[in-house]
Amino acid sequence: IRCSGSRDCYSPCMKQTGCPNAKCINKSCKCYGC
């Protein structure tokens, strides 16, 4: 998932992991579990 900021990752990661824990690293999202 491409992103410009961590905020861009919250909803896609919420769908993937069920949790909004996410960071934008090198313009792509990194999802973390709960």
Curated annotation (Swiss-Prot):
Q: Does the keyword Secreted apply?
A: yes
Which SUPFAM superfamilies does the entry link to?
A: Scorpion toxin-like (SSF57095)
Which residues are marked as site: Basic residue of the functional dyad? K23
Q: What else is known?
A: Negative results: does not inhibit ERG1/Kv11.1/KCNH2 potassium channels. May not inhibit neuronal human alpha-7 nAChR, since it does not inhibit alpha-7 alpha-bungarotoxin binding (IC(50)>>20 uM).
Q: Which PROSITE patterns match?
A: SCORP_SHORT_TOXIN
Output one GO MF annotation: toxin activity
Write down the position(s) of the site called Aromatic residue of the functional dyad: Y32
Q: What is the protein name stated in its UniProt record?
A: Potassium channel toxin alpha-KTx 6.13
Instruction: Please give the positions of the paired cysteines in each disulfide bond.
Output: C3-C24, C9-C29, C13-C31, C19-C34
Entry-linked Pfam families: Toxin_2
Q: Which residues carry this modification: Cysteine amide?
A: C34
Query: Which organism does this record belong to?
Result: Heterometrus spinifer (Asia giant forest scorpion)
